[in-house]
Each structure stands twice: as C-alpha cells, then as structure tokens.
Amino acid sequence: MIKKLLLMGMLLGAVRAGAQTYTPTADNLAARQNFQDMKFGLFIHWGIYSELGAGEWVMNEKHIPYDSYKRLADFFNPQAFNAHDWVMFAKKAGMKYITVTSRHHDGFSMFGTKASPYNIVDATPYHKDPLMELAQECVKEGIELHFYYSLLDWGRKDYAYGSPIVDGKPANGDWDSYISFMKAQLTELITKYPGVKGIWFDGHWERDVNWHYDEIYGLIHKLNPAILIGNNHHLAPKEGEDFQMFEKDLPGANTTGFSGKSKIGALPLETCETINNSWGFNITDRSFKSSKRIIHYLVNAAGLNANFLLNIGPMPNGKIQPEFTDTLAVVGAWVQKNGEAIYGTRGSGIPAQPWGVITQKDKNLYVHVMTAPQQPYVFIPQLKGKVTKAALLADGSAVKFKQQTEGVFVYLSGVATDPNDTIIKLTTN
C-alpha cells in the first residue's frame, strides 16, 4: 500500500515549479484519500466581528477605523461557547471534519498566540482558548480539525503595501516581518493543537505579491508532512498544495465569478457554501437554505468528486442558532440513512445528468435521482462494466434495468421515491 501511495504521489502529486518539486509523503497521500472519503465538513466563521451581527467583512463594509474596531475585543466574552456542543452538532449532521477560522482578515486571532497580543486569550475578558477546547473535543469524538488562516490582514502595520480598505494604514509595510509573523502563528497552530489535519488559506486574491509559499508550505510540511494545505486563491493548484477548493461553486462552474481561473487539477476537491448568505453571524440574514437544497449540494459535489464544506456563523455568545440546528438535524437523518452512497465514494466519471449525478465505490454505482425525469426511466451513458443488479438503496427492493451498447436504462415505474434524492444502487462485475 505504501509503495502504491508513493507512486501515486510521483504521478499525481508532484508539481514542478522552477527547480523545486513537491513530492507528498505516503502519509500525506493517505491523508488525501481519507479527506476524499469524508465528503462532508462543517465550516465555522467566528470572531469579534460576530458581535456586530453583520458578517465577517463588517469592518470593511461599514468603513470602521481599525483602532475603533479593535475595541470589540474588550467586549467579546462568549460564555455560552461549548466545544462539545459544536462537535456534536457536526456529528449529528453527518459531518466528518471541521474547518474553523483561527484568524480572519480583521487580524484578530481566535487562539492563544505568542506572536501577537491581539488574540482571544490576551485581549478579551474571556481569557480562554476556544480552539484548544475544540481541538481536544475533535480528537475525543473522532472528528478531523482544519484551521482557516487569513493571509491578508487589515490592521497590522507590517502588512506590506497597506490596505485600500482601512483608513490610516501606511503605504508600505515590512513584508519580511509579516511573513515571519505568519510562519510563527502557523507553527503554533500545527505544533500546539492536537489532531490538526489541514490548513485552509484565504486572502491571496487581495494582492498580487510574493506570498512566499515555498517557505510557508515548506514549513508546514516540515512540521507535519501529513498536513493538507489548500488555498482559496481562485486559481489552479500551486506547488505544495494538497487539495483544491472552490468558493460557492461546484467544480467546473463559475456562477459567482470567483472560479474563472480555477482550472481543475489532479488534487482532491472541495467546495464551500454558506447555510444562509453570510459567512459570519448576520442577525438580519434570514435566507436560510432548506435541508433539501443542502442535501442536493452535498450529492452534486460528491458526484463531481468533491467534498462539501457547509458554513455556519455562530452567535457572538458562542451558541449555534436554532435555525441551523433544526435544518442540519434533517440533513443528518438523511445522511445517516443514505451515507453508503456518499462516504468513501468518488465521482463516477459519468457527466451530471438533468435528473442528477452518479457516485461510485468499488464495483457499485449510486444513481442519485434528484429531479424526476419526464419519462419513466433514467438513462446512464458511458457506463463501463456489466450491470448485474439494480436495487433501491432505501429498502433493497429490485429495480428493473436494461443495458445496451450506448448505456443503461433504469426504470422508475413502481419505485418508491425520496423527496430529496432517490438512490438506486447498481452492482457491476
């Protein structure tokens, strides 16, 4: 197995950039496979911006001077935060990993760091490290933990070139100092917190500068070669990265305008979306996605060989609002019943159809019918292998099918349908 993984690394993972080549270790390749198996994750945006109830970009959108914004730390005291509740929320929803903001664009660190006093332990009356509690609880409950980390910083004086969205920032910073600061924090996150499996970078898109990824990625993989690195730069994968992400779009789509240059590479894929229209807590955003829409996003992502990372913004007191818990309880019940067709699957290579998608695991194909076709059957083109059996996943009842040279017809007459996703399991030889 180890030799096979190393060979995969040389064929798929090694990306040449100049004279340097990143070759992932066997442990890293195994972590990639496990990442793809998990399929469903929880994204959490939480910080002092949550107090204002207007999303994580409130400092920018409301043009709040940095010195004024920093005062929010004086009032941030999330006494209702409970790491166990967060982790169990994810588990009950069928999620296998959590990605949480360790530091967002406002520069405030949500963990105890020695690299800056502007952090939740030193700058707030809370004086505790919620990410340490979360990391420990994730280990206890068997949930993987990834840290979101912002590359840009709206407040630090050494953030080079200043920032056009914050009044009073110097035109020039100390780029070497800023890179050193990030490396110090990343070292803390990887070495201090138990069970960390990934780093999720964001903010590259603000400036066309040398982010010193060779140093930063090299440091991370030196500290822990199995750590998975992803970067929300909206570009094709770069040297040293281990998975590719897509923001608010499925791989290959560009409805948001973010993914115009995101050519799909050979790395594991992940797409992220919000449960309403905001990443951070927004008290006026009531545009909650239905459980059916979330299930469809999860299924469509899996059909395109991608994970689905669903975001919530907890309230400033640390609690998750009931609208989220109610919706995700329904999603979790569906995933518990139909997880065989999601977890551990890969995209079948068969293009998405008007009625749905197909996932694959071993010799089984899972036909996800999410939109009822006009005719009493679905047609599956380009199917390799001979189908020996077709059955409804929900109860194992037989489903009629006919295989021809051009594809397979699966007949839906008399099949008990699911309002979210009717899944038919095809077994091939």
Predicted regions and their residues:
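Bacterial Sec-dependent N-terminal signal peptides
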Residues: 1-21
